[in-house]
Structure formats: C-alpha cells, structure tokens
Design a protein with these regions (language model features):
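Residue-level detector of alpha-helix boundaries and kinks
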Residues: 30, 34, 69, 113-114, ...
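Outer-membrane beta-barrel translocator domains and adjoining extracellular loop/strand segments
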Residues: 107-112, 156-157
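Sec-dependent bacterial lipoprotein signal peptides
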Residues: 1-5
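Short, P/G- and charge-enriched loop/turn segments at secondary-structure junctions
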Residues: 81-84, 113-118
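N-terminal segment of the mature soluble domain
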Residues: 23, 27-28, 32-102, 128-142, ...
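C-terminal/domain-edge helix-coil "capping" segments
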Residues: 6-20, 87-88, 100-103, 119-195
Length: 195
C-alpha cells in the first residue's frame, strides 16, 4: 500500500540571513588549475547566495594575491582578515578554494596529439568555502562540496598540464560548477518542506 503525501509545501527561510553580516566581501576563489574555472565558480557562488536573500551589499575584492598585496600580508590569517575588514570597511568576507584533481581526458584514438589541443575530461572537484567575521578574524561558517563530472574545453599542454579556458564557461563547466555551488550555498537559500 502506497501512502501519498498531500500536505502543502511551506517555505523555510535561509538558515543564514546575510543582511546581518553586511557589508560582505568576496575574494575570488583560489584554484590550482589555470584558466577560468575558479573565477567562474566565484561568480556563480555570489549569485547563489544572493538569490533568496534581500538586497545585500557584496564587494568583489579580486584575487587572494591582490587582496594580500593591498593589505601587506603574505597569507590569509586572523590578522589578515581583520586588516581586510579595516581596508575595505567590511563586516565579513567569503574566501574559498576550488580543488580539481584526477583529470581524466577523453581522447579518441582518431585524434592526433598536438600541444594545445582542447578535449573533454572527467574531473573530481571540491569547493571549500568559509565566511569570516573581520572584527574578530573568526570563521562564522564553512562548508565543502565535492563532485565528479565530465567537462569540456580542457586544453592539454606538453608535459601533462591542463588549462580550463573555455570561451563559454557555462557550457563547458556549468554542470560541475552548478552542482558544487548549489550544494555549498544551501544555508543561504530558501528550502521547502511539506506540512
């Protein structure tokens, strides 16, 4: 005997209200892989955390290297986050890293290998993100999300290097990045439950 739920759906607000943490800065997520994958992921994450929030003020701070150079530090630390807050007049900062490992190119035997060839590849990826309060330098929230997906437009170079440099990142990496971002940003978004 099957039971069918007929209860109505009720909206549950985000677990974290970002208006309580404004003004917010976001440092472009670090990524070991060269190319557009990490900046694309940062942009998608920013869009996702804003989606179900009221108007929130977010400042794009640039890359970690640029931010550290501006504040005179060599790594992100408690003191560095406090300096970021003072320099940019921010209450909280998002920082993260996109780790891509085990790139498995899909190369057919009919292709002749040449340096600079673009192929699709299956990759394992993990997105790690934290939100840090600048006054104390303490982490308020953190998460990680992992996925394995096939992506396109991976350039291969002599010596085994890979570059994620698609002209259209949404088409090439969208499935992977959307999964990682949706999973990592869930605490900032509306959810639904049945009553």
């Amino acid at each position: 005997m099957a039971v069918i739920s007929c209860g109505r759906k009720v909206m549950v607000p985000p677990k974290i209200d970002l208006t309580q943490h404004e003004v917010i800065g976001i440092i472009e997520f670090k990524g070991e892989a060269e190319g557009k994958l990490a900046p694309f992921t940062t942009r998608k994450f920013t869009e996702a955390i804003r989606r179900d929030q009221e108007m929130i003020r977010i400042v794009d701070l640039g890359t970690e290297d640029e931010v550290l150079r501006d504040i005179g530090y060599d790594r992100l630390s408690r003191d560095a986050f406090q300096a970021i807050g003072e320099e940019y007049d921010l209450a909280t900062v998002f920082a993260g890293e996109l780790l891509v490992s085990d790139v498995r190119p899909d190369i057919s035997l009919s292709l002749i290998f040449t340096a600079g060839m673009s192929v699709s590849a299956e990759v394992d990826a993990t997105l790690e993100v934290q939100m840090v309060e600048t006054e104390s330098g303490a982490s308020l929230w953190n998460t990680s999300s992992s996925a394995t997906r096939e992506i396109g437009y991976v350039s291969m170079w002599e010596g085994g290097g890979f570059v994620f440099d698609a002209e259209d990142p949404e088409k090439a990496y969208g499935d992977l990045v959307n999964y990682l971002v949706e999973d990592a940003s869930r605490d900032f978004r509306v959810t639904w439950r049945r009553e």
